[in-house]
Amino acid sequence: MPKMKTKSAAAKRFKRTAKGGFKSGNSFTSHRFHGKTKKQRRQLRGLSMMDKSNVKRYKKMIPAK
């Protein structure tokens, strides 16, 4: 059976955690910050955990090493 290929688009956008979940960057963070409050900007920093309902789909896109 051939090896599963990693979807390169998914690999660029998501990072796998030690427990098998996924982290991703937040949307709405590239420009137009003048329309967002200080609290919104602060909460959009860093990575956020992906919802559990999507994890199964992304595990197929990014197979384990």
UniProtKB/Swiss-Prot annotation:
Keywords: Ribonucleoprotein, Ribosomal protein. It comes from Limosilactobacillus fermentum (strain NBRC 3956 / LMG 18251) (Lactobacillus fermentum). This is Large ribosomal subunit protein bL35. Residues 1-18, 31-44, 55-65 have a biased composition (Basic residues). Residues 1-65 are annotated as: Disordered. Belongs to the bacterial ribosomal protein bL35 family. One of its GO terms (cellular component) is cytosolic large ribosomal subunit. InterPro entries: Ribosomal_bL35 (IPR001706), Ribosomal_bL35-like (IPR021137), Ribosomal_bL35_CS (IPR018265), Ribosomal_bL35_sf (IPR037229). The lineage of its organism: Bacteria, Bacillati, Bacillota, Bacilli, Lactobacillales.
